Amino acid sequence: MSFDFTDKLSATVGARYYDVEVDLAGGANATFCNPFFANDQNAFGTNISDLYDGDGSLRFTSDCSTAPRMEAGISFDEAYAIFNELDAYSVDRGKYVNAPNAISEAEIRGYLKALEAPDVAAASGTIWKFTMSYQPSDDVLWYATYSEGFRPGLLNRPGGAQGAGGYEVPFELATDDVTNYELGWKADMAGGTLRFNGSAFFVEIDKLQTTIFDPSIVNLFFSDNAANAEVMGIEGDITWLPQALPGLSIGGAFSLLDTEITDKLIPTNDVREGDSLAFAPEVQFNANARYEWNLSSGLMAHVMGHMAYSDESYSDIITINRDVIDSWTMFGVTAGLASDSWGATLYIDNLTDERAELSRNYVNDRQRATYARPRTVGIRLNFNF
């Protein structure tokens, strides 16, 4: 909804209601207990459909035996007796070794916690957006915005896995929430030949969802609400049409970021307060200059040069999973002809053949990088029918 208080001052209010449920279904198990096309016993793995059905019961899956279902409310001693009757050998081994055919007390306690696993990760609520805008003249607009956002929660396949320091992989993640405060402007200056749009912003991130790979806890990826964080920044774009040289246009854009993890929410040194967020270069900018002129044949010709720069950043907030994404600078040029019905453009992207890193990770203790395309030369043709 929009409200005009005066011809210069207005307000806009928006809201969106969400009711989201995220579920997991299926199985992740071995085939040892399924000889000769027998029914799947869901053994030596996780019966995900059974775990996340919310009925408060769960069948033991670390043995080929036809095990009884355990119900919520059962005590540890009662569960221990059931396991001992089912497979006394494995229970006895669990007192001394950690092996697939050893049932430890920690594993039994994990099954008891799994009895309380939810049916779905549910989230509902309303997010809001408020904007006030003030236009003192036809050439200038100021605005202030408050907005909210969130991502739905998740379910973890290895929920309940135990780590050092009493850490336990959660069965269900909470939403992570964003609150944004922004002050922006749109301005035409120098007789309309210079345009400068931009904004300054502050963002609070609560309960940031993060995917983790830590074999000391479990040999699977899992997610958790790992940290709270803050983002401060300024961004803008500029377009200039010099009056002294008709046909020339110069443009560019920039982004300055200061990101910080303010609180860690999981008991691990793999998340560090004060570190920056992932994929958040402190400085990014691009620029271009294009010159157009009319030929005697009636065609429009142009030449253009452009460049882009990105500062270095981290690929993750989890220190054991992250790598440094190097800074890079890329250049390109184009030249072309156009008429009312067709156009042809010769282009060279990544003129200096920069090995620009667009993404990187260090998951599984192996460096993986995604690079920009190498120097690319081509011709683009377009026709209007």
Regions found by a protein language model. Give the residues of each.
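Membrane-spanning beta-strand positions in outer-membrane beta-barrel proteins
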Residues: S2-D4, K8-G14, V22, T131, ...
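Membrane-embedded beta-barrel scaffold of Gram-negative outer-membrane proteins
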Residues: S133-G159, E172-T239, S255, E260-T262, ...
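C-terminal beta-signal and adjacent terminal beta-strands/loops
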Residues: E204, M307-I318, G336-F385
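Solvent-exposed loop segments that connect transmembrane elements
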Residues: D23-V120, N156-E172, T210-S223, I261-D275, ...
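Residue-level signature of outer-membrane beta-barrel architecture
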Residues: F3, Y17, S124, M132-Q135, ...
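Short sequence motifs at beta-strands and strand-loop junctions characteristic
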Residues: E21, P118-T126, A174-D177, A226-M232, ...
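Hydrophobic, lipid-facing positions within transmembrane beta-strands of outer-membrane proteins
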Residues: M1, T126-M132, V169, T179-L183, ...
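Gram-negative outer-membrane beta-barrel transporters
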Residues: D7-A11, T193-I205, Q209, F222-I318, ...
